Amino acid sequence: MDFRTTCEETKTGVCLLQDGNQEPFKVRLHLARDLLMLQEQDVLCVSGEPFYSGERTVTIRRQTVGGFGLSIKGGAEHNIPVVISKISKEQRAELSGLLFIGDAILQINGINVRKCRHEEVVQVLRNAGEEVTLTVSFLKRAPAFLKLPVNEDCACAPSDQSSGTSSPLCDSGLHLNYHPNNTDTLSCSSWPTSPGLRWEKRWCDLRLIPLLHARFSQYVPGTDLSRQNESQVVAVDGVCSGILQCLSAEDCMDWLQAIASNISNLTKHNIKKINRNFPVNQQIVYMGWCEAREQESLQDRVYTPVFLALRGSCLYRFLSPPVTTWDWTRAEKTFSVCEIMCKVLKDSDLLDRRKHCFTMQSECGEDLYFSVELESDLAQWERAFQTATFLEVERIQCKTYACVLESHLMGLTIDFSTGFICFDAATKAVLWRYKFSQLKGSSDDGKSKIKFLFQNPDTKQIEAKELEFSNLFAVLHCIHSFFAAKVACLDPLFLGNQAATTAAVSSASTSKAKHLA
């Protein structure tokens, strides 16, 4: 793909578009800050206000050297009309100003050749006389196999040599000599050109894809099969770009990264606007698309697009992005960020051919598997989840869970400042208390019981404490969240990034970070 980058937010290039069952054809992509434009070439009359005209009639004379000054490809054998594939410099076809590469020849001297084979059209043009009148119409979606140049400035030099053979996929130069004695010459009728009209080939909008909350993918929908050098972009309203085919994997990745960057910038800007309407404890940290892997799917579609959002204390899973306040109450699923475990997967842990995956284990032990498109998307998600967890732990400071110790109802408080506190649920009397730094290990039975191994600060001996919970995974994940927040407080880089993120999503000042007790 040939492209030029005008600035960080814009990019222009030419690629192929596979739209439904049609043959791929050339389109121009133009990436703006908030829009991806797909454009196709067309020929417009630009005398006065530009307008489309389906057909043009052009009369040109044959030259001794160079003939008509054009070459053709295609034909009925490929289910398309014959198309002008080259126009020679400073020859009759170019000087007329009315013929363009990509024009389909519909009539020759009034004879309908729309459904003629390539060689038949060549013969008609050979025998057309010194002057020929062509009725043409620009073939906007010329199949890519014709390999037509995008621009008119092809290096096609005039020649007076003739060819005895022609091929529908090779340029047949129509500079052939006129044969006046040929009895098969077809009769002519007068088709005058339109005086005073000027025509130009231009790129015209074919499809507009708004980028706010748009998604893109290199994979065949619902599968882990990656298309080679291909991708598609889908707008939030479901409008799809079609399959965009690049010349190389590098070009494809350049486009995906540029599109992803613009989508990300739009999302961040939108989050800032939405957060003005939410209190400090309900600020949005992240919004974006990913694909969820369906567990034990019996259908061909293993992956389904889902929209994830981190807001306040919750992770929301939507089928489509929330637009109104009411939409936030209709999430497909909602999880407490402190009670879920997120893990970015290494290549050796992936379940299939999709890269850039992460898992989440819910508070009830359900394992969820997600895929994103780019490595940068995965890094962005990981940072956002860490930030959301940190902010929530800082906000709540402590979390208490009911538990059972030797058939007695107890409570376990996980406190960000002091550590672990176990107390009698009835009397509130504290049974034991340990700091986070005293926890040297733990184990669980995967059902309800957790065994904590604490180090006594005086004797240095390990003391085992076993508690039974009705919500085992929620407790385990909450403990992990508090430990992660403690570790984050010791990381200057994280604290710097977290401060910037907090300032972006909230006007409230960040509470002072507490260090490991």
UniProtKB/Swiss-Prot annotation:
Pfam families with a match to the protein in the record: PDZ, Syntrophin_4th
SMART domains tied to this protein: PDZ
Signal peptide: none
Principal cellular location given in the protein's record: cytoplasm
The organism's place on the tree of life at top rank: Eukaryota
Keywords: Actin-binding, Cytoplasm, Cytoskeleton, Nucleus
GO CC, one annotated term: cytoskeleton
Comment text on domains: The PDZ domain binds to the last three or four amino acids of DGKZ. The association with dystrophin or related proteins probably leaves the PDZ domain available to recruit proteins to the membrane.
Quaternary context: Interacts with the dystrophin protein DMD and related proteins DTNA and DTNB. Interacts with DGKZ.
Family in the record: Belongs to the syntrophin family.
Its biological purpose: Adapter protein that binds to and probably organizes the subcellular localization of a variety of proteins. May link various receptors to the actin cytoskeleton and the dystrophin glycoprotein complex. May participate in regulating the subcellular location of diacylglycerol kinase-zeta to ensure that diacylglycerol is rapidly inactivated following receptor activation.
Entry protein name: Gamma-1-syntrophin
Species name: Mus musculus (Mouse)
